[in-house]
Amino acid sequence: MKILAAIVTHNRRALLTRCLDALDAQVRRPDGVLVIDNASTDGTAEMLASRGTWRVGQSNLGSAGGWHRAIAETLAHGFDAVWLMDDDGHPDPQALAVLSGAITPALACISSVVLREDAPDRFVFPFPALDTDGHPALLAWPRKLATLPELETRTRDRTYPFAHLFNGALVPRRTIDAIGNVEPAFFMFGDEVDYFYRMRRVGPVLSHLDARHYHPDVTVRPLTETKLYYYLKNTLVLNHRYMNRPAMRDAATVGVGLYRYARRNGWRAAVEAVGSPSAVARRAISRGLAGQVGRDHGG
């Protein structure tokens, strides 16, 4: 299998360098490495040129536009699979060997688990407990599996039927041929969830516990007004596109989004997001419930 490792980046030269070094250290080396550069201005292009790394530059089309271009290049250059990852994480040396050894014709995708680099038994993005339909459970306890030992109690053959794309996801060409490319209109947030559910239509999407991808803790990062907007809008779109009990999920989405925004920016900022003249949250909710995707707020 001819595998392309593809990274999407924007102004994270140091972290991107670390990720590229981790690709060089893979036991099973990728057959090509591509960086989609979303208009970086921090010397990324020069760094990649000095390493001789294949770079495709484009305007900042967000994560969704980056993944769309990476998959298009995979198809155009005749690769059998693409290994997709963001620029701020880095794979364990065994990761691609595990994934490429575990992929079968029956699977739509197999992905790494994403672990905190400062606490490598804890997930950056906790796994949901799943209901009988395979959706994240609303009423289970615990609803989230936050550590590797917790997930191990729920797995079969070291795999779990859910994945947090795109942090070490191996996607075969046959899956792309069947479902198409990532939808670039999502811009940021939700593109990976949309692709996950589209892939599940053609086969299982699994995370493999022995394929590890290390990543910074995202809970300490700023949550800007723009990020809140796209999180709310796109998650509401997805609730109605794929999920059971969408109204309950909508309420949870809005509550969780505003709580996270308040924790990082203060409760006054959260109240203004709902009640101020700009009312970014209200606009996001209205457009999300109308099913609108697209780049329609901020940068």
What are these regions, as identified by a protein language model?
Residues 21-30:
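Short, acidic, metal-binding catalytic loop of nucleotide-sugar glycosyltransferases
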Residues 22, 35-46, 89:
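A conserved acidic beta->alpha catalytic loop
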Residues 45, 49-65, 69, 73:
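Conserved donor nucleotide-binding strand/loop of the catalytic core
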Residues 79-88:
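Short beta-strand-to-loop acidic/aromatic patch adjacent to the donor-nucleotide binding site
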Residues 94-135:
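Conserved donor NDP-sugar-binding/catalytic core segment of glycosyltransferases
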Residues 163-171, 175-180, 185-211:
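A short, conserved alpha-helix in the catalytic core of glycosyltransferases
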Residues 204-225:
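Active-site donor/metal-binding and catalytic loop motifs
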Residues 226-234, 244-299:
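Non-catalytic, C-terminal membrane-associated alpha-helical segments of glycosyltransferases
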